[in-house]
Curated annotation (Swiss-Prot):
Compartments, record wording: Cell membrane
Keyword list, A-Z: Cell membrane, Lipoprotein, Membrane, Palmitate, Signal
Taxonomy, superkingdom: Bacteria
Subcellular location, principal: membrane
Topology with respect to the bilayer: Lipid-anchor
Protein name: Putative lipoprotein MlpA
Signal peptide residue numbers: 1-21
Length: 236
């Protein structure tokens, strides 16, 4: 059983995807994942970038980016899988004739039932990568994502709309490690705005019970995406 990850469209926008309330002891659901071509993902650095010789280097993962997230279930075995497709890879895939969409997407095994505190664990992810051809101003490069210990929060209060995990990111020969904090839907924001709808507040489209902050896409900019403010699950 296969699905075309690149062309998969968001088809599930049910009333349960934006739940409110503060009773976090509601009955658990199965391992639900909000499938979408765009989640907002924040990367918190754990280990600074180093090259193959262990020397410090400067290339890092994005501060925040969009990521495609999809769940697949084998109808014959019932086994579930989770697919992660970072925008950094997808945006460069068009110019890469040496890899396929399968190479550019990380696929791992996913629990079928929540375990501890409403989390569904996903592991055994294959690395995802693209090869960037050399240009007049830059050498050839391989950008590589390696995900581990991914945990989707699937409790009934907010089923499948937040996840966390670990990332090892390599680009330009620099490798660094991060903890991920991700939320759906992706809400654009502007730290310079006083309008709640433009700064992760009322009207942003996010679950009003989520504790979120605006993370600019660059260190000097003001525009970016709303991301979880704390550890997952991030609630007020």
């Amino acid at each position: 059983m296969t699905k075309n990850i690149v062309n998969t469209a968001l088809v599930l926008v049910g009333a349960g995807s934006l739940l409110t309330g503060c009773n976090f002891e509601q009955p658990e659901t199965n391992c639900f994942v909000q499938e979408s071509p765009s989640w907002a993902v924040k990367y918190d650095v754990v280990d600074s970038p180093k090259d193959a010789n262990g020397d410090e280097c400067t290339t890092t993962a994005p501060l925040v980016e969009l990521m495609g997230v999809y769940k697949y279930v084998n109808p014959e075995t019932g086994a579930a899988q989770l697919a992660l497709r970072p925008a950094t890879l997808a945006s460069r895939a068009i110019a890469d004739t040496t890899t396929t969409s399968a190479d550019q997407t990380s696929l791992g095994s996913l629990d079928t039932e929540p375990k501890d505190h409403g989390f569904c664990h996903a592991n055994d992810f294959a690395p995802a990568f693209v090869n960037v051809a050399a240009s007049d101003t830059a050498a050839a490069n391989t950008i590589r994502y390696e995900f581990t210990n991914v945990r989707v929060y699937s409790a009934a209060v907010a089923p499948g709309t937040q996840f966390t995990g670990e990332l090892k990111y390599t680009s330009n020969g620099c490798t660094s490690s991060y903890v991920m904090r991700a939320v759906w839907p992706p809400a654009p924001c502007d730290t310079a705005s006083t309008e709640p709808a433009e700064n992760c507040g009322v009207g942003s489209g996010l679950n009003p019970e989520f504790a979120v902050v605006c993370q600019p896409t660059s260190a000097t900019g003001t525009t970016g995406y709303c991301v979880p403010a704390g550890d997952i699950p991030s609630f007020k």
